[in-house]
Amino acid sequence: MMEDNKQLALRIDGAVQSASQEVTNLRAELTATNRRLAELSGGGGGPGSGPGAATSASAAAVTVADSAVATMENHQHGAQVLLREEVVQLQEEVHLLRQMKEMLAKDLEESQGGKCSEVLSATELRVQLVQKEQELARAKEALQAMKADRKRLKGEKTDLVSQMQQLYATLESREEQLRDFIRNYEQHRKESEDAVKALAKEKDLLEREKWELRRQAKEATDHAAALRSQLDLKDNRMKELEAELAMAKQSLATLTKDVPKRHSLAMPGETVLNGNQEWVVQADLPLTAAIRQSQQTLYHSHPPHPADRQVRVSPCHSRQPSVISDASAAEGDRSSTPSDINSPRHRTHSLCNGDSPGPVQKSLHNPIVQSLEDLEDQKRKKKKEKMGFGSISRVFARGKQRKSLDPGLFDDSDSQCSPTRHSLSLSEGEEQMDRLQHVELVRTTPMSHWKAGTVQAWLEVVMAMPMYVKACAENVKSGKVLLSLSDEDLELGLGVCSSLHRRKLRLAIEDYRDAEAGRSLSKAADLDHHWVAKAWLNDIGLSQYSQAFQNHLVDGRMLNSLMKRDLEKHLNVSKKFHQVSILLGIELLYQVNFSREALQERRARCETQNTDPVVWTNQRVLKWVRDIDLKEYADNLTNSGVHGAVLVLEPTFNAEAMATALGIPSGKHILRRHLAEEMSTIFHPSNSTGIRESERFGTPPGRASSITRAGREDSGGNSKHRAGRLPLGKIGRGFSSKEPDFHDDYGSLENEDCGDEDLQGRPEQCRLEGYGSLEVTNV
């Protein structure tokens, strides 16, 4: 806009200057014309020619003046837009004046030549001259008016320039303010970004602290649960010891008074034919320490019965034949673990296997009583309260005719001094022996031959389910009825509401059914729920779930049927990695055919050497981590579920996953590389091939190893074994991401069809399901 105003002002100035020049030129021409007219009039030209020329010149001058005045007037009333047109008009008038000048010049020439016919008089010339002078005066006034307009325009121009300068100044100030605002905004934005980053860092720190507190709370909860489970286990152990003490005292009373009857029970049982199968009493199970001591004290002076050294083989328990002797029995006592003592077979058979009876040595009675008194004194020191007899009555009462124990058995005085107490102890001993005979029939007689008492003894003692004995006594009268029971019958007839308890009974019944069909009882039957809850869960590093497994009575057969949904729904194993750890631990048991002896033998061989890592326990993995100079991180694997089967059988559990489980920071690349090198030397896939395909610890007939059976079907007709365990697929694409967040997508355990011919009645909800976002934790 300022540029347009400047250009307009320049054009106006140029037009005014050109008009001034034209007016000056016109004045000069008029002066020259007047002078020539005066010369003509003074020179005495013709009387007719002089006035005529003067008149024409005056007329021309008047015309020019009139036109100039008109032009000036138009210029005064015109606007700035009409200035250009006025300049053009002035130029045209100048052109006309020039033409008139030429005409006047021609007239002068004609007048000089005497061609003019008429000459104005001097008076007329004077009149015309006066008129011209007036016209000139008007022209001067017009010029002055034009000059005044020019001055006014210049003033307006100056005002416009000053206004433009003010606008420029205002604009510059606004621009400066805008720059200041932008500068302040940028600074404020940077400060806001810094504050947001600081808040984000603080938030991350608080999140880490929150998760750390949660982890610590979880650890504290797990530790409290583990302590609570240990306390419960100790209480249960105390009750079992009390029961065993009562059994020992009553057995002692029975042995001292009824040795011939004890001798008859120790003899090999008669054979029972069932088709081509022969059921023989197996006497290779160890006795409890107290009873073994009493028997050795009573019978040490007599030679063993010849039948004790014969080889006894039972189709129900297809074990390696063993020669029973006093030395081997003593060695069995020394090598037995607390879990072995607590097993159903040990508890139920400990009173049935002894040396050959002989005459009672009365002189040896006092040391036996003294040893029992020492045991009772130790028990009283641990628990100074009156011992309850509920568990003992449940174990040794028969049916609905339950009798109280003789209180004289727990007296420190000599039990032989009173005839009444002696007779009561004999009757109680007979009931105990009757119950033990029923338990003995459980392992020596097919289930279809069982009577009602044998079924009740099996349910109460072997299966550890005394809560269902009453309903069983009312509804189940024989083993054939037990074999024909369905899951609905178990729930309605026996009141078994727990699905896991029903499955435990179903698996046991099917196992005995297979034993009658010609196969032996599975070795998983030797793994009772005490061993699973105490020893096995501790070996795989998940002892925090011991109480749940104990409550649901999970034994070896149950382990072989557990699936992901069972772990999550019934056993409260919610973490995916813990579920995988348990399933891989079961897979290892499956590879060794659920042989506890074979597993312990392999673990003993690799205790001091870094070999056979597939059988490593969680404690052995911790020892290996300490041996490779990572002891500051070893404690993070406690109760983490990391054991040898996870390290070997799961190919996606690599060094990154192990480092994450150990809690090694991602920035410590040297430690992670060191761990990867150590793992590659121990857990290389080629090192475990022989372990997984070990011929020494083969799989049951009709089942291939879970590592090599992929893509093959079992055509041998063993539907139970074919559907008993589902193969484990890839658990995930990786365990090492913790950017949980450590939250990559992981794969899943493969689902396979359980088979329509599954005799174990595997429930639909127990089938293996997929795992999503599997996560390794060090909690």
UniProtKB/Swiss-Prot annotation:
Family: Belongs to the kazrin family.
Compartments where located: Cell junction; Nucleus; Cytoplasm, Cytoskeleton
Modified sites of kind Phosphoserine: 356, 371, 391
Protein name: Kazrin
GO BP of this protein: keratinization
InterPro entries: Kazrin, Kazrin_SAM_rpt_1, Kazrin_SAM_rpt_2, Kazrin_SAM_rpt_3, SAM, SAM/pointed_sf
Source domain of life: Eukaryota
